[in-house]
Amino acid sequence: MVNLTINGQAVAVPQGTTILEAAATAGISIPHLCYLKGINEIAACRVCCVEVEGEHAMVTACNNPVREGMVVHTNSPRARSTRRVNVELILSQHDCKCATCVRSGNCRLQTIANDLGILSVPYETQLPTGQRAAWTTTFPLYRDAQKCIKCMRCIQICDKVQSLNIWDLAGTGGRTTIDVSHNRVIKDSECALCGQCITHCPVGALRERDDTQKAFDALADPEKITVVQIAPAVQAAWGEALGLPRELATVNRMAAALRALYDSMGRAAPVSTEENPAVVFDRAAEK
């Protein structure tokens, strides 16, 4: 075991544990944007920087292992100042129209900026424009280049988990951004629309195409007969989302609330999150 001190608290963790993981075992949260354990540990965002006694430079917590006797400060004036500057620089290259963003209230960048008390950005705003910001509006997956913070999560999750290699870096220097790999447009790629990149994007740079208005138009059309179609994953998770105990969150109760339900068990359309087969089978058994 390696013994160290974090914010005055003695911590003992196995050899090879990162500072971020060691802090978590002690109940100390270190802000981060790009980190995904075992998938994206490249410290691209620099938000997890901490102060380590004896080190001249700030140290990224997500990819630096602990050492015996290390003394770490995660919330010292120097650590907070460094973190604040790094977040301000990220915000200077991010479209900060939070009120109209689909991730408002559920955005890691927004949360960290609020925690740091950032109310304005002292740097010139630099957002991609023209061809660098272009995207088709008809594809089910939508990307907003002006919100991308270049954390690389989408690249790594698509490469290492889905093995589809849809995303890659494009451009050089200050013009570096994320785009579809091999100079393709998204509709010509092998994108499976699994939704993993959307799920792991810490901001609103990736989202599903919004067809809400089309649904309302269909509901209002007297020439159309509409029914509700529910995927198995929704049947299993709706109660949790509403804070209902499992014995109350039954399929029958949901069907009664929706008045008309066409159960698509066994042939649901693909959804953006993976379904647990055991849960689906349990639901089928209830029937």
Predicted features, each with a name:
Residues 20, 110, 155, 198, ...:
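Short glycine-/small-residue-rich flexible loop motifs, especially phosphate/cofactor-binding loops
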